[in-house]
């Protein structure tokens, strides 16, 4: 069986990786995240498991320090002659340490940047075909939505259709969460919030987006507010739960904390006019959170 190694610096991608693995007959994934590499022994074990891999992908979050034992892994894989793809953020080291052809590197990067189960699956198929000699077909990278609605009971549902399932006699609460969590199917905490709201007699309206998106074709939290949370100037929700980690005051971004600004009160949430509650999430795994006495980090 052809083997592909995959390291991801965050656990956010593990949901889509796990689902992709279930679709890959004849392709075995060796997967680790930063939380799996507690010491050098763990790093060495990961590399040992990859010594006969068709290719290895190191999917970093920023620079080299987002992977424990990075230099050892790169040097050892180079010695073994294993094709290596390093995906970093903005640093030349990733290009330098990547050993596959530039065109292949760029295609793999596009799979990873677009993300989601379908792109992880076909990234692995591409690697297995091009570097493992596996007779398998693969699709080009697929563009996924950058904003939309989600509900655990209605996969792939659209905004209007989800609202049609609501009881008009019940309050409606929006649940804002990051597009990347929807893309990689990291939605258990969203599901839990939806279930909790519904058990208390409310309609749950989970919405994903990039809160400060400024790229063409992407809509931000202000657009979501104006188009999905307001109708004829009136709110269609009674409250919002937001798990975004940064300020939603879009026109105040970049302002010094000591400067109240000229328009601190004139932000798009004022147009909505309903309570917005900040929910607290953590990048740590549940097991690490439960075994720690330091609280949420």
Model-identified regions with their sequence ranges:
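An N-terminal assembly and electron-transfer interface module characteristic of large anaerobic redox
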Residues: 1-297
């Amino acid at each position: 069986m052809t083997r592909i190694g995959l390291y991801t610096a965050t656990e956010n991608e593990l949901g889509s990786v796990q689902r992709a693995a279930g679709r890959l007959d004849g392709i075995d994934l060796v997967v680790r995240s930063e939380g799996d590499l507690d010491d050098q022994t763990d790093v060495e074990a990961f590399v040992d498991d990859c010594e006969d891999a068709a290719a290895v992908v190191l999917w970093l979050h920023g620079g080299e320090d987002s992977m424990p034992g990075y230099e050892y892994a790169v040097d050892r894989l180079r010695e073994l002659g294993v094709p290596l793809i390093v995906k970093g953020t903005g640093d030349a080291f990733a290009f330098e340490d990547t050993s596959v052809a530039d065109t292949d590197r760029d295609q793999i990067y596009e799979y990873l940047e677009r993300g989601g189960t379908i792109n992880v699956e076909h990234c692995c198929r591409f690697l297995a075909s091009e570097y493992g000699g596996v007779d398998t077909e693969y699709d080009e990278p697929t563009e996924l939505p950058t904003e939309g609605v989600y509900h655990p009971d209605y996969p792939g549902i659209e905004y209007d259709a989800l609202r049609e399932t609501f009881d008009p006699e019940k309050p409606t609460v929006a649940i804002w969460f990051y597009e990347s969590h929807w893309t990689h199917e990291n939605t258990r905490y969203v599901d839990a919030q939806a279930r909790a709201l519904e058990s208390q007699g409310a309609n749950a309206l989970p919405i994903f987006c990039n809160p400060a998106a400024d790229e063409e074709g992407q809509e931000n939290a202000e657009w979501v507010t104006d188009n999905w949370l307001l109708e004829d100037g009136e709110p269609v929700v009674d409250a919002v739960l937001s798990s975004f980690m940064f300020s939603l005051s879009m026109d105040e971004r970049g302002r010094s904390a000591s400067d109240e600004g000229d328009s601190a009160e004139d932000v798009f949430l004022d147009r909505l006019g309903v309570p917005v509650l900040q929910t607290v999430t953590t990048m740590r795994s549940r097991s690490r959170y439960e075994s720690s006495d330091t609280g949420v980090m």
